[in-house]
Design a protein with these regions (language model features):
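Active-site/ligand-binding loops adjacent to catalytic centers
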Residues: 1-55, 99-118
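Phosphate-binding loop/pocket of nucleotide- and phosphate-handling active sites
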Residues: 1-2, 62-118
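Glycine-rich beta-alpha junction loops
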Residues: 8, 12, 39-40, 60-62, ...
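Substrate-binding/catalytic subdomain of NAD(P)-dependent oxidoreductase enzymes
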Residues: 26, 41-46, 54-72, 80-81
């Protein structure tokens, strides 16, 4: 499949046991796996950068996209403990930067302060 999350989309050639182990862990924990779209991944990547100050690559943001999808689908209980591991620095794949409205300011600390305070 073609996706922006190339780091997690492969055929596991040469390490097929990783997929088997992953499925076993999901089954033992009574968990689940789900698919997320490139748009959901980009939305998670942008959210993480803008709201949390974390710039992760698309593969790293896929877990947050899955969390959002699971929550909106009612799959996460109010008393659930959820952990999402974020990996892969955003500089590995910077395509999402085109989605940001990045302000350009003069070389003046007062302009920077204004941007930060807004």
């Amino acid at each position: 499949p073609k996706t922006i999350a190339g780091g997690i989309c492969d055929g596991l050639w040469g390490y097929a046991d990783d997929g088997t182990h992953t499925l076993n862990y999901i089954r033992r924990s009574e968990g689940y796996a789900l698919a997320v779209s490139d748009e959901e991944i980009k939305a998670a990547q942008i959210y993480l950068a803008q709201k949390e100050g974390l710039f992760v690559e698309p593969s790293g943001a896929a877990g947050v996209a899955g969390l959002v999808k699971s929550d909106s689908g009612g799959m996460i209980g109010a008393d659930s403990c959820v952990i999402v591991i974020l990996s892969g620095h955003g500089l590995k794949d910077m395509r999402v930067l085109g989605e940001f409205d990045i302000p350009v300011i003069d070389n003046d600390v007062r302009e920077l302060i204004k941007i930060v305070e807004d």
